[in-house]
C-alpha cells in the first residue's frame, strides 16, 4: 500500500515540499537561510502572541505594560527579549538570504525573487511598527520622523500623513492602528512565504554553480532536514546567547525613557537593520529626493534580473563580479555605520559617497563587469 504521506491531500503537499522534494546535491550552507527565516517567523509569531496577551495599545499604559511584562509576568522578560532580538536574527538571516540570491544569481527565478522582495518590504514594515509599540522616546520620534516622510509626496502628502496618524500628530490612534497592523502582518508574511515556496518548487532550487542540477538530485529528507536542524541549533544558540547575556546590546538607550512629545532626542535613529537605508535617506539634502532614494535602495532588487548581463548565472566563476559583490557588502556595512552617526562632518560626506557607490555598483559597475567577463571568455 502507498504511504499515507503520498496519498493524503494535505500530507502530500508537505511531502512534496519537505520530504520527497528533489534537491540539488551540492547546495551549501548559504541555502540554509530560507528554513531559518521560517523558524524566525514562527518564533516571532509565538513570542508576539504571548506578549500581546499582556500588552495594552494605549499611550497612557503601553510603556507601563511592557515594564509589567518584564517584571511581573512569568518569564515575561525572556519572551520580550526573544521577540526583540528575534527581529535582529530575522534581519541577519534576511540579509544573508538576499545576499546569497545576488551572488549565485537566484534572481533568475523572477516570480520567486519578486515575491521575496515583497516579503522584505512587508518584514521591514512590520519591524518598524513593532518598534513603535513600547512607546519609548525613540519609538515615538522614530514613528514621527518616518511617517512624516510621506508628506514629501506632492499634492496628497500632508493628507496622507494625517490619515495614517489618525490625527494631527503621532498619538493614541496611531499606536492602536500600528498594534493592529503589527499583529496581522506576520500572518500575511507567512502566506506570502508559502507563495514564495510555491514558485520556488515550480523550478527547483538553484545551486552554487548556477548550472542545471536536474541530472543530480537527492531527496530533501534526510539530507537537508538534518542540515537545516544544524542551522536552527546555531540560530537558537546565537539568539539565546544574545538574549541571556546581552539583551540590550542592539537596542537604543534612548528608548528607555517613556515617549515625550515635548522633548526631542539628540539623535533620532532606527534599529540597526534599517541604518543602511536611513543613511541613504539622510545623504540627500532634499526631502522628496531622500524618500525616493530610500525606497529605491530596496526596490532596486526588483531590477536585478534585468541588470544581469553575464552569460553565467552564478558569480562562482566570475572573479571581477565577486570583487564588486564584496565591495557592495563593505559599502552596505559602511552605510550601516554612518546611519548611526550624528549628521556632522566627516559623516555627511562619507554617507553621500557610500550612497552614490551603492547605486553605482548595482546599476553600472556590476553589469559592466559581467560584460567584460563575457568578452574574456572569448580569449
Curated annotation (Swiss-Prot):
Binding site for heme b b562: 83, 182
Gene3D superfamilies assigned: Cytochrome Bc1 Complex, Chain C
InterPro entries noted in UniProt: Cyt_b/b6_C (IPR005798), Cyt_b/b6_C_sf (IPR036150), Cyt_b/b6_N (IPR005797), Cytb/b6-like_sf (IPR027387), Cytochrome_b (IPR030689), Cytochrome_b_C_euk/bac (IPR048260), Cytochrome_b_N_euk/bac (IPR048259), Di-haem_cyt_TM (IPR016174)
Keywords: Electron transport, Heme, Iron, Membrane, Metal-binding, Mitochondrion, Mitochondrion inner membrane, Respiratory chain, Transmembrane, Transmembrane helix, Transport, Ubiquinone
Coiled coil ranges: none
GO molecular function, a single term: ubiquinol-cytochrome-c reductase activity
Residues annotated to bind heme b b566: 97, 196
Places the protein is found: Mitochondrion inner membrane
Membrane-topology descriptor: Multi-pass membrane protein
Pfam families associated with the record: Cytochrom_B_C, Cytochrome_B
Membrane-spanning parts: 33-53, 77-98, 113-133, 178-198, 226-246, 288-308, 320-340, 347-367
Record's GO cellular component terms: mitochondrial inner membrane; respiratory chain complex III
Positions that bind a ubiquinone: 201
GO biological process: mitochondrial electron transport, ubiquinol to cytochrome c
Listed cofactors: heme b
Cofactor comment: Binds 2 heme b groups non-covalently.
Other comments on record: Heme 1 (or BL or b562) is low-potential and absorbs at about 562 nm, and heme 2 (or BH or b566) is high-potential and absorbs at about 566 nm.
Subunit structure of this chain's protein: The cytochrome bc1 complex contains 11 subunits: 3 respiratory subunits (MT-CYB, CYC1 and UQCRFS1), 2 core proteins (UQCRC1 and UQCRC2) and 6 low-molecular weight proteins (UQCRH/QCR6, UQCRB/QCR7, UQCRQ/QCR8, UQCR10/QCR9, UQCR11/QCR10 and a cleavage product of UQCRFS1). This cytochrome bc1 complex then forms a dimer.
Cited function: Component of the ubiquinol-cytochrome c reductase complex (complex III or cytochrome b-c1 complex) that is part of the mitochondrial respiratory chain. The b-c1 complex mediates electron transfer from ubiquinol to cytochrome c. Contributes to the generation of a proton gradient across the mitochondrial membrane that is then used for ATP synthesis.
Protein name: Cytochrome b
Record organism: Sylvicapra grimmia
Lineage: Eukaryota, Metazoa, Chordata, Craniata, Vertebrata
Amino acid at each position: 500500500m502507498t504511504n499515507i504521506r503520498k496519498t493524503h491531500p494535505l500530507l502530500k503537499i508537505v511531502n512534496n515540499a519537505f520530504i520527497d522534494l528533489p534537491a540539488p546535491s551540492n547546495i551549501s550552507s548559504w541555502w540554509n537561510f530560507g528554513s531559518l527565516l521560517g523558524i524566525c517567523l514562527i518564533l516571532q509569531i509565538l513570542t508576539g502572541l504571548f506578549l500581546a496577551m499582556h500588552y495594552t495599545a494605549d499611550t497612557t499604559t503601553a510603556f507601563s505594560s511592557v515594564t509589567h511584562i518584564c517584571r511581573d509576568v512569568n518569564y515575561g522578560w525572556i519572551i520580550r527579549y526573544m521577540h526583540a532580538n528575534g527581529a535582529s536574527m530575522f534581519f541577519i538571516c534576511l540579509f544573508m538570504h538576499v545576499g546569497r540570491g545576488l551572488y549565485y544569481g537566484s534572481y533568475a527565478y523572477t516570480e520567486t525573487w519578486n515575491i521575496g522582495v515583497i516579503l522584505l518590504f512587508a518584514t521591514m514594515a512590520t519591524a518598524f511598527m513593532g518598534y513603535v509599540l513600547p512607546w519609548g522616546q525613540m519609538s515615538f520620534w522614530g514613528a514621527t520622523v518616518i511617517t512624516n516622510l510621506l508628506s514629501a509626496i506632492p499634492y496628497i502628502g500632508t493628507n496622507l500623513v494625517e490619515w495614517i496618524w489618525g490625527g494631527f500628530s503621532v498619538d493614541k490612534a496611531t499606536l492602536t492602528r500600528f498594534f493592529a497592523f503589527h499583529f496581522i502582518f506576520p500572518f500575511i508574511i507567512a502566506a506570502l512565504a508559502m507563495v514564495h515556496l510555491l514558485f520556488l518548487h515550480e523550478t527547483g532550487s538553484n545551486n552554487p554553480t548556477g548550472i542545471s542540477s536536474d541530472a543530480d538530485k537527492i531527496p530533501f529528507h534526510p539530507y537537508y532536514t538534518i542540515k537545516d536542524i544544524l542551522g536552527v541549533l546555531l540560530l537558537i544558540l546565537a539568539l539565546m546567547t544574545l538574549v541571556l547575556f546581552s539583551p540590550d546590546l542592539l537596542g537604543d538607550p534612548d528608548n528607555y525613557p517613556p515617549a515625550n512629545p515635548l522633548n526631542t532626542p539628540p539623535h533620532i535613529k532606527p534599529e540597526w537593520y534599517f541604518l543602511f537605508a536611513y543613511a541613504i535617506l539622510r545623504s540627500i539634502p532634499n526631502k522628496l529626493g531622500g524618500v525616493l532614494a530610500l525606497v529605491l535602495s530596496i526596490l532596486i532588487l526588483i531590477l536585478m534580473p534585468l541588470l544581469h548581463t553575464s552569460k553565467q548565472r552564478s558569480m562562482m566563476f566570475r572573479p571581477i563580479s565577486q570583487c564588486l559583490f564584496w565591495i557592495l557588502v563593505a559599502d552596505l556595512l559602511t552605510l550601516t555605520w554612518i546611519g548611526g552617526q550624528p549628521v556632522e562632518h566627516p559623516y555627511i560626506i562619507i554617507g553621500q559617497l557610500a550612497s552614490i557607490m551603492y547605486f553605482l555598483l548595482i546599476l553600472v559597475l556590476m553589469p559592466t563587469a559581467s560584460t567584460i567577463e563575457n568578452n574574456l571568455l572569448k580569449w
